[in-house]
Amino acid sequence: MSQIFADRRAAVPARVISFCGAALAVWAGLAVQPAMAVDPPVDCGRALGLHFWSSASLISDQTPDGTLIGKPVVGRSLLSKSCKVPDDIKEDLSDNHDGEPVDIVLELGSNYKIRPQSYGHPGIVVDLPFGSTEETGIAIYIDFGSSPMQKVGERQWLYPQKGEVLFDVLTINGDNAEVRYQAIKVGPLKRPRKLVLSQFPNLFTYKWVFMRGTSQERVLAQGTIDTDVATSTIDLKTCRYTSQTVSLPIIQRSALTGVGTTLGMTDFQMPFWCYGWPKVSVYMSATKTQTGVDGVALPATGQAAGMASGVGVQLINGKTQQPVKLGLQGKIALPEAQQTESATFSLPMKAQYYQTSTSTSAGKLSVTYAVTLNYD
């Protein structure tokens, strides 16, 4: 029994070694076969879209994010009408694929940042180069007009119009497809100024993709799109008010002799800075006011113990010496904003205590007015 077992063990390794040797010989034979050469995509060159955008637009702090600005710029004939193909596929295209469609894919240039949201619009939003979007809150909105933007890859979209194989070249017929550009408000206005939208080099790379979505997919040709938007001026106008706290003098409760009593009038200045000669006005509002009396704000309900009651604060316009009407109906024009491009000025105001009830109590008093700038 032991001898038979030994013979079988000896035979097994011999077969294994022989089999491996044959397998190695076959592998070595496959390794020396040359790979088929594939030529790179043909360079179709640059396509320049030169457009004119003559409208001037006014943007302010109150312009909502997502607002499209001015008129859209429409670009057609953005792509080369025809392109050559790599030499290694010319004969196959001419013999077997004449007249077949070729997809055109646009890929956003690497120097352009896509915003994560398009603010309800069907296209894409792209930041301006050189950090301009962070300063101005303005970006560029791009879409394909009436055609949807079909995303086919990272930073890639399918151009609405197809090309086709014409013997051994690629061609595109007509100018039906379009790419539209428009400024869009996307953030706060940190640096007001005149913004001129101009050159956008290498905005897109366009690729002629043959048999896209199959195992034989291949980019046969490609080029770049430079967009030059001329005379596109956006006036980034703004006014800023610096929040402030105004302190009124301490008064004696005994001095409050009846509803309508006013005491402790205090002068102060409301500081403003405006840029770009805006036509602007300002108005004040308060959460809780005294019915039937202009300019009187009351303390918020639910204040801590020890706060005064039966008294509010009334605002007086320092120019007219009249109580300020609260809300939009009481807006005050600021003509000083239009005197220079960058204007710093103050609006004279006064504040005073105003007795609102026959029942009063001593303590601290705090009221808040909201200041709103309104651009005409």
Curated annotation (Swiss-Prot):
Name of protein? Protein FhaE
Stored Gene3D superfamilies: Fimbrial-type adhesion domain
Keywords recorded for this protein, A-Z: Signal
Q: Where is the signal peptide?
A: 1-37
Query: What is one Gene Ontology biological process annotated in the Swiss-Prot or TrEMBL record?
Result: cell adhesion involved in single-species biofilm formation
Q: Name one GO cellular component term.
A: pilus
User: Which Pfam families does UniProt cross-reference here?
Assistant: Fimbrial
